[in-house]
């Protein structure tokens, strides 16, 4: 029996809910035949897919090992835990949830420290005065080392943090921190501020592929189907379908509509009877409808699109190119 295609998704909380909703919108409903507490699942209509419910950090580790084909996890975890991440995994697509920034934060009382260059000066002075290096509390050890090296900050040492990193300066276990934040409210509540150029990484949940997984022909075909579904849903979300028919509908009018409203005519120009189907950005719907009526249309209908399939599959092309490298 051919080994299954393994998709790893978060096992709890909002990340799990958002991941399941994302796949459901693409027509890829995840289910747990063994019940809510089961850590294995399936996708309706894809018999050779096994869904593995794991923590976000476990997903990153399994992508690195090649024991899953696709995984949903944050870019911050990939960059932190996988050496040479761009060679070993592919960020296929950002999923639009799980947004957070990895940042350098210092006490608000450091009024003269606003940039990494200022921090370099302060760390150098701190070592000269105290005969020890300034401490940085973080769980992002590799990201911190890389970012500080880019800014030529060397007089520091990392204090590994297991949790509640933002409290480290207040309790005296570190002078500053590198941590992940969404709004910055928790940092501010702990008397910290983000440096002006201290955003190390703008992260979100991504659909990620592993280079080291077993990419058999059957598995690649499954990946193509999954990515085709996702791409068709993304394409559909950008447009509404507009339909009309009137005698004055011609190629010149269509060209003007393309230029003014950013429409796409997926089935070509108007038919001999003046029938026209357009895909229009939602923000331009009223303007387009008014334009068509001004030029003779009696009725213009607008409908939502569920999926728009195209001969091109840009997400799968991206994956195929990555696996060829």
From Swiss-Prot:
Belongs to the ATP phosphoribosyltransferase family. Long subfamily. InterPro entries: ATP-PRT_HisG_long, ATP_PRibTrfase_cat, ATP_PRibTrfase_CS, ATP_PRibTrfase_HisG. It comes from Rhodopseudomonas palustris (strain HaA2). Its main location: cytoplasm. It holds the Pfam family HisG. PANTHER family: ATP PHOSPHORIBOSYLTRANSFERASE, ATP PHOSPHORIBOSYLTRANSFERASE ATP-PRTASE. Catalyzes the condensation of ATP and 5-phosphoribose 1-diphosphate to form N'-(5'-phosphoribosyl)-ATP (PR-ATP). Has a crucial role in the pathway because the rate of histidine biosynthesis seems to be controlled primarily by regulation of HisG enzymatic activity. One of its GO terms (molecular function) is ATP phosphoribosyltransferase activity. Pathway: Amino-acid biosynthesis; L-histidine biosynthesis; L-histidine from 5-phospho-alpha-D-ribose 1-diphosphate: step 1/9. Its EC number is 2.4.2.17. Its cofactor is Mg(2+). This is ATP phosphoribosyltransferase.
């Amino acid at each position: 029996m051919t080994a299954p295609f393994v998709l790893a998704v978060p096992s709890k909380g909002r990340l799990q809910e958002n991941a399941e909703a994302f796949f459901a919108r693409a027509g890829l409903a995840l289910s747990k035949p063994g019940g809510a507490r089961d850590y294995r699942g399936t996708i309706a209509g894809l018999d050779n897919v096994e869904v593995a419910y794991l923590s976000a950090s476990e997903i990153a580790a399994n992508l690195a090992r090649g024991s899953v084909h696709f995984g949903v996890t944050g870019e911050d975890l990939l960059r932190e835990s996988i050496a040479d991440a761009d060679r070993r995994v592919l960020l296929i697509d950002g999923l639009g949830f799980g947004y957070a920034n990895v940042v350098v934060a210092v006490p608000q009382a450091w009024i003269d420290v606003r940039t990494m260059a200022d921090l370099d000066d302060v760390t150098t002075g701190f070592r000269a005065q105290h005969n020890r290096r300034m401490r940085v509390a973080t769980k992002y050890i590799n990201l911190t080392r890389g970012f500080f090296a880019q800014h030529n900050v060397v007089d520091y040492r990392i204090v590994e943090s297991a949790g509640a990193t933002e409290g480290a300066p207040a309790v005296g276990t570190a002078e500053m921190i590198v941590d992940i934040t969404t709004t910055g409210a928790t940092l501010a509540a702990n008397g910290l501020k983000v440096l002006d150029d201290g955003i190390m990484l703008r992260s979100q949940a991504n659909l990620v592929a592993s280079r080291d997984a077993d990419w058999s022909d059957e598995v690649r075909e499954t990946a193509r189907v999954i990515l085709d579904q996702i791409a068709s849903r993304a394409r559909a979300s950008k447009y509404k379908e507009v339909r009309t028919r009137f005698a004055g509908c011609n190629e010149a009018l269509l060209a003007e509509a393309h230029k003014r409203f950013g429409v796409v005519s997926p089935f070509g120009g108007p038919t001999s009877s003046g029938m026209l189907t357009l895909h229009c950005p939602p923000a331009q719907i009223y303007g387009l409808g008014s334009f068509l009526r001004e030029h003779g249309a009696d009725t213009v209908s607008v409908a939502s699109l569920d999926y728009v399939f195209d001969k091109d599959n840009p997400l799968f092309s991206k994956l195929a190119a990555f696996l060829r490298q």
